[in-house]
Amino acid sequence: MGAPMAVILIVEDEVFTREVAEMTIQDWGHQTLSACDVEEALSFLRSAQPIDVLFTDIYLRKLVTGGCDLARQAIALRPELRVLYTTGNLVTDKMKALFVEGTRCLRKPYTPHELQDSVVAVLAA
């Protein structure tokens, strides 16, 4: 088997949701890294580990903008990183203003097809 198509860091505090996203993305040939919170994600981002996409929940451990804050820190560390947000909550204009420019948001619950379309779109951007 060849090299993975992309390395995707999944940041999700809900274990089941994170594991399903991991399995789904791996089924398409991508490599995944997973983190349950901002601190764990930042340890990956500060390492030499290649990462192409940050796929992060917006609400992490009751931090209303945890994923948005993480994305800004991630882009500061890795300007070439692509970001895909996810949330089960309504995304308001106020929330969108916190997004890193040029990013997308996938609304939960999402289907594997919707996740795949979003990952493909983010990688193509």
Ranges and model annotations:
Residues 12:
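Conserved acidic carboxylate
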Residues 96-106:
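As written
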Residues 15-33:
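Two-component/phosphorelay signaling modules centered on CheY-like receiver
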Residues 57-72:
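Conserved phosphotransfer microenvironments
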Residues 110-122:
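C-terminal output helix
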Residues 22, 34-53, 61:
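Acidic, metal-coordinating helix/loop segments flanking the phosphotransfer/catalytic sites
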Residues 46-49, 73-81, 98:
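Conserved phosphotransfer cores of two-component systems
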